[in-house]
Amino acid sequence: MTNIRKTHPLLKIVNHSLIDLPAPSNISAWWNFGSLLGLCLMIQILTGLFLAMHYTSDTATAFSSVTHICRDVNYGWLIRYLHANGASMFFICLYMHVGRGIYYGSYTYLETWNIGIILLFAVMATAFMGYVLPWGQMSFWGATVITNLLSAIPYIGTTLVEWIWGGFSVDKATLTRFFAFHFILPFIIAALVMIHLLFLHETGSNNPSGIPWDSDKIPFHPYYTIKDLLGFLVLILLLMLLVLFSPDLLGDPDNYTPANPLNTPPHIKPEWYFLFAYAILRSIPNKLGGVLALVMSILILAIIPFLHMSKQRSMMFRPISQVLFWILIADLLTLTWIGGQPVEHPFITIGQVASILYFSIILILMPLASLIENKILKW
């Protein structure tokens, strides 16, 4: 008798995706982040569902409802902080996952890569709208500033912003629709994840060497299921350390003040995971130019596969590209720091230099390094 997992229509899909899946024998811990992102998404959907049971999306009661969750609901504080810090863990895993893709040349799987970029945009949109929901000072002013950026679009900009707001300012209509979108988007993300995996399983996983490893594949279970479980434990440990010891470490104190349209906070800034893009936005004195740079800072990922000039897929054996890659990481950390600083000297100049360096490394220096490395191969 054949095993049920190989014959049952539903279990067969699970079997081919998680049990009998042939996987390269040499994939490192950098390949753990895909499953960790799946775990993060599940944590966010579950905690979000329980928060939605007690939250009210009305400007008059939104802030109070969050306070009520933290004070009166059984373990409400835990659910709320798991959700808030879970988002931070989500983005840490996301950025590491993307970084892994760039380093090891996984972007050559075009369909998987492009769905990944769409996923990144969807997660960023979800996180932004979620930040607005507690209706604190930074929620309100963050929503005002970021949605206002769309007014830079020629001709239709102002109309578009008012259409998104549902009025002439960020108000009740905005909060209600943001809650609706924030609730539905994670399920759309989950569907996109399925497509992401579908495309990945068409080609199979990449590996650190970047060389096809078909001659030496091992079953996903038990080898990588155990490895993923270890990753889960580490992620949950780090998340619980954050939630139970310093839940407000990554948040903004201004968000503990109820939203007040008449009082602007001295420094309006988004959550830490958007600061690098925010720094790029601020480094350009022109509004439309800034918005274009902001969008391009993420959309540039879609251009990376077409800038791959190297004869090797992975950066594992490409020292010049490796140095540039780590300079890029340092540059992103610098941008993250600058995004949280006030707009004054010397931060303006540092931000502009870091922004130019960011685009230069990806668009010019990395392709050049690849060509030089190709030449070195012939020596």
Curated annotation (Swiss-Prot):
**What would be the name of the gene that encodes this protein?**
MT-CYB
Q: Tell me the residue numbers annotated for binding heme b b566.
A: H97, H196
Give the record's membrane topology: Multi-pass membrane protein
Q: Which cofactor does it need?
A: heme b
Show the InterPro entries listed in the entry.
Answer: Cyt_b/b6_C, Cyt_b/b6_C_sf, Cyt_b/b6_N, Cytb/b6-like_sf, Cytochrome_b, Cytochrome_b_C_euk/bac, Cytochrome_b_N_euk/bac, Di-haem_cyt_TM
The subcellular location is: Mitochondrion inner membrane
Record text on cofactor binding:
Binds 2 heme b groups non-covalently.
Supply the name of the protein: Cytochrome b
What does this protein's UniProt record list under function?
Answer: Component of the ubiquinol-cytochrome c reductase complex (complex III or cytochrome b-c1 complex) that is part of the mitochondrial respiratory chain. The b-c1 complex mediates electron transfer from ubiquinol to cytochrome c. Contributes to the generation of a proton gradient across the mitochondrial membrane that is then used for ATP synthesis.
Please name the CDD domains in this protein's record. cytochrome_b_C, Cytochrome_b_N
Q: Which Pfam families match?
A: Cytochrom_B_C (PF00032), Cytochrome_B (PF00033)
Give the multimer and partner information. The cytochrome bc1 complex contains 11 subunits: 3 respiratory subunits (MT-CYB, CYC1 and UQCRFS1), 2 core proteins (UQCRC1 and UQCRC2) and 6 low-molecular weight proteins (UQCRH/QCR6, UQCRB/QCR7, UQCRQ/QCR8, UQCR10/QCR9, UQCR11/QCR10 and a cleavage product of UQCRFS1). This cytochrome bc1 complex then forms a dimer.
Family statement:
Belongs to the cytochrome b family.
Q: What else is known?
A: Heme 1 (or BL or b562) is low-potential and absorbs at about 562 nm, and heme 2 (or BH or b566) is high-potential and absorbs at about 566 nm.
Q: Which species is this UniProt entry from?
A: Lepus mandshuricus
Q: Which Gene3D superfamilies match?
A: Cytochrome Bc1 Complex, Chain C
Instruction: Please list the GO biological process terms of this entry.
Output: mitochondrial electron transport, ubiquinol to cytochrome c
| PROSITE patterns in UniProt | CYTB_CTER (PS51003), CYTB_NTER (PS51002)
Question: Which GO molecular function entries does the Swiss-Prot or TrEMBL record give?
Answer: metal ion binding; ubiquinol-cytochrome-c reductase activity
Entry binding sites for heme b b562: H83, H182
Bilayer-spanning residue ranges: 33-53, 77-98, 113-133, 178-198, 226-246, 288-308, 320-340, 347-367
Going by the UniProt record, its keywords in alphabetical order are:
Electron transport, Heme, Iron, Membrane, Metal-binding, Mitochondrion, Mitochondrion inner membrane, Respiratory chain, Transmembrane, Transmembrane helix, Transport, Ubiquinone
Q: Which GO terms describe its cellular component?
A: mitochondrial inner membrane; respiratory chain complex III
